[in-house]
Amino acid sequence: MHSTQIPPQQKQKRRLRLTVLAAAASMLAAACVSGDDNNNGNGSNPNTKPANIGTVTINSYNGTTDDLLTAGLGKDGLASATAPLPANPTAPTAAELRRYAIHTNYRAIVDTTASGGYGSLYGPNVDAQGNVTGSDGKVAGVEYLAFSDDGSGQQNVTMLVQIPASFNTSKPCMITATSSGSRGVYGAIATGEWGLKRGCAVAYTDKGTGAAPHDLDTDTVPLIDGTRATRAAAGKNAQFAAPAGATSLADFTAANPHRLAFKHAHSQRNPEKDWGKFTLQAVEFAIWAINDRFGAVSANGTRQRTLDKDRIVVIASSVSNGGGAAVAAAEQDAGGLIDGVAVGEPNLNMPPNTGIVVQRGATPVAASGRTLYDYTTTANLLQHCAARATALTQAPFYTNPATATFFANRCQTLAEKGLVSGANTDEQSASALQALHDAGWEAESDDLHPSLAVFDVAAAISVNYANAYAQASVTDRLCGYSFASTLTDLKPAAIAPAALASMFATGNGVPPQPPVQLINDLDPQHGPYLNLASVSPSTLREDLNYDGANCLRSLLAGSDAAARALQAGQALTLRNGNLRGKPAVIVHGRSDGLLPVNHTSRPYLGLNRQQEGVTSKLSYVEVENAQHFDAFIGLVPGYSNRYVPLHVYLNRALDAVYDNLTAGKALPPSQVLRTTPRGGTLNTPAPALLPSNVPPFAASPAAGNAITVNANAVQVPD
């Protein structure tokens, strides 16, 4: 890696001069082998494997029985709700887990219903130019799989490179697809689809997170391919093995059986601080893999680095946490690996006291630029109560008898604690909803609060990030929380062997997700108990563990050791806004209830302008009627009537950045994109999504749609 950065435009000119050389070199490429640890150190420009990369496994896929994008399932297989279950559920093979993981993760990110646009506006059968084809979308090619580690075996970040058979050495390209959420390495396969269709390599990483747990009962851990082994047998090959805290794992498990540890929460490494670094490492690994296949061979048989970083168009991409990782990578890219950025709904932790004012219409917004942990612990206190507001009676999951009493009890507790006002649930819930508005949520997010509350999303994220930032051990049970499977008595129970065996494929890395639940270990009536139905010690009421939620919130400003550790950990995750002159497009749904635009993409646009001034090449597109979870559009009644898929606009952002880098086409200016919901009522199927529902970026947005920015303010039209 060079110590100085080559500007993207200079890299583009250099690529044009070297196209003929690259094409000639590709003719000398030798066949690929099934495994590779060769550091290729004997040539004049050897293709040296990065020092952080361990043993590499290479698998080839023929594009018929198996492939890179659909794992042999094809377009219809991905759309099917019937998962490709392993033949032996308690002992799945690596190939079965891969297929299952691709099916699960693709469907977790996009809406796979035909009426929602799958198969017509996006999906494996829609080609790179947007044409609907008769293809099943299978993509032949190879995968390179390895750990990135510091030698300790404690990091073991999964790296995966997909190189399609259509990779064009005359026009080499690559995108990153860092996993969203806390998912495993296939977590952003739906983002990778864009690259595979264009013949680009895709650089994936799980960024130090992952779906499969360390089961403390059996002391078994996941390996890189999702299969499991005992911790002793796995050794340094474990994808994750939980470190002990003040208490040994054996002693902890004897006193607290059936608990599970997850890598993001319990690795004690605060992986988020390194998401940018891991994404850059994925790019470096991908460059090595590309040359391992296509690099020229010297006279002594050494593979050369024919296609280096200056010859490959590299776009950092992904969504949610993966999108935030792409932005972090661009900010940290001192070596000029990345040429452009195209991300959706990114998680962006803003630094404090930037002085940036976010204004919507003629009015500054109530709050902006807070961190994920700040606003999510706020939601974790208020959202369950706000979900009962009578203004939301037509919202998805408003009517949910299983949780209505718990939500009302939370309202009562909040009123007693002075956090909301009102004499009854209706008044208290209206107060809670207003408090969310005051904390920076737009009114467009209102209809999302009931469903997000039912899914306990804010609690899941608050617990996960509290542990991660504080670098807490699973044995610490920070704020009295733990993770375990439960049975009908709602108490911790041994996880079913088949469920555990497939969690690499089925999990998202952030409980609760059945069969793993969030446990309140401090319930005074039941003992350790399902958090959602548990009793708080201070109220002796089933109020969704208010005490736990309040404890998590207090860590943000507290002064004890855990609070100080959390605050220090969070400080390592803040963005700086300097994209180093790279062309970039961020798309974000205005209705996002998980990562609100006022705390993420809107203020980041201002932060970037502070850092880069008028030379900034960042465009921000705010999409009306889009929210965070496209997969819910086809799954949760009421979403399809209200929301359009943001995935359409991520693909268009990638198109725009690619066209800018390769053809000099201007990026779309920052704008509000006015979409049209599909319509219909809560419990009736929405009409099919049409192109007219999701219009393209405007090359010259009307004045009423243009987003403007200077070093001190971001102005977003109503």
Swiss-Prot record:
Catalytic residues identified in the record: 320 (charge relay system)
Effect of residue 320 to A: Loss of catalytic activity
Catalytic activity: (3R)-hydroxybutanoate dimer + H2O = 2 (R)-3-hydroxybutanoate + H(+)
Source superkingdom: Bacteria
Protein's GO biological process: butyrate metabolic process
Pfam families found in the cross-reference section: 3HBOH
Primary location recorded for the protein, binned into one broad class: cytoplasm
Keywords recorded for this protein, A-Z: Cytoplasm, Hydrolase
Cell location: Cytoplasm
GO cellular component, one term: extracellular space
Single annotated GO MF: hydroxybutyrate-dimer hydrolase activity
Functional description taken from the UniProt entry: Participates in the degradation of poly-3-hydroxybutyrate (PHB). It works downstream of poly(3-hydroxybutyrate) depolymerase, hydrolyzing D(-)-3-hydroxybutyrate oligomers of various length (3HB-oligomers) into 3HB-monomers. Seems to have also poly(3-hydroxybutyrate) depolymerase activity since it is able to release 3HB-monomers from artificial amorphous PHB.
Protein name according to UniProt: D-(-)-3-hydroxybutyrate oligomer hydrolase
Gene: phaZ2
